[in-house]
């Protein structure tokens, strides 16, 4: 975690040149083909000075609590993609079966605590919890019980009330995923985004798209976050 905070501080001070330096360093240290491919893509994306990734990183550093950013980064990056995926790959080679480093489940399922505990032992630390038909704040108790995991909480924007957002904000290992039925920043979406931003939370607008609205979704992706 100390290294994560140091990296964030370096990028704050050194700007995007330092970001490229970190990506180059990680690329040189990558051992597995998937890791090499990931950092090769990151290098390519950062070659363009007008890349939307620069504004994305700048926005993250300005609006997201640093402890939250580092916790999610370590839990997902190291726990999920480096250590966890390597452990699951070993077992997959023995079993001869494919594996996934991310698991989806229904938020509030009473079986989840036991399932998450069992998954941790196998190297699985990243979850997406579907709360689109319920109360997204139910994820808070699970996230607190498993601080080494990262939880993405998929929720309807109108369900992300200030009170529920406040409960989720107590968990540094949660990423909120407001689900948009179309690439449109409706009043409910904007209200949810403002509530999340007020708590310096990490969130990603998640859009359901098909061929008819894919281009519109790309424009939404490159737009600034909803503002007051």
Task: For every predicted segment, state its role.
Residues 1-45:
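Long terminal accessory regions outside catalytic cores
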Residues 41-105:
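N-terminal [4Fe-4S]-dependent radical SAM core
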Residues 88-93, 115, 164-165:
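Short, charged beta->alpha transition segments
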Residues 102-114, 121-135, 146-161, 168-187, ...:
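Core AdoMet radical
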Residues 116, 139-143, 165-166, 189-193:
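Generic structural signal for well-ordered alpha-helices
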Residues 197:
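Cysteine-centric redox/oxidoreductase cores and disulfide-bonded domains
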Residues 216-220:
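Catalytic cores of alpha/beta
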Residues 221-228:
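Conserved small/polar residues in nucleotide/adenosyl-binding loops
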């Amino acid at each position: 975690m100390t290294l994560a905070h140091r990296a964030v501080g370096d990028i704050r001070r050194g700007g995007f040149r330092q970001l490229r330096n970190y990506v180059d360093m990680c690329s040189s240290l990558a051992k597995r083909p998937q890791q090499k491919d990931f950092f090769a893509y990151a290098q390519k994306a950062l070659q363009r000075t007008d890349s939307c990734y620069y504004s994305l990183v700048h926005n993250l550093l300005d609006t997201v609590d640093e402890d939250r950013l580092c916790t999610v980064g370590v839990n997902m990056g190291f726990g999920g993609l480096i250590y966890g995926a390597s452990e699951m790959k070993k077992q997959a080679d023995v079993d001869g079966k494919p594996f996934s480093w991310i698991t989806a489940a229904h938020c509030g399922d009473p079986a989840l605590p036991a399932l998450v505990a069992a998954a941790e032992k196998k190297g699985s630390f990243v979850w997406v919890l579907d709360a689109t038909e319920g109360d997204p704040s139910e994820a808070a108790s699970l996230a607190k019980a498993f601080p080494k995991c990262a939880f993405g909480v998929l929720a309807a924007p109108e369900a992300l009330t200030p009170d529920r957002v406040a409960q989720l904000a107590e968990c540094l290992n949660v990423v909120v995923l407001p689900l948009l039925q179309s690439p449109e920043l409706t009043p409910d979406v904007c209200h949810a985004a403002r509530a999340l931003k007020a708590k310096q939370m990490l969130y990603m607008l998640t859009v359901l798209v098909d061929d008819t609205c894919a281009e519109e979704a790309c424009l939404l992706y490159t737009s600034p976050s909803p503002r007051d």
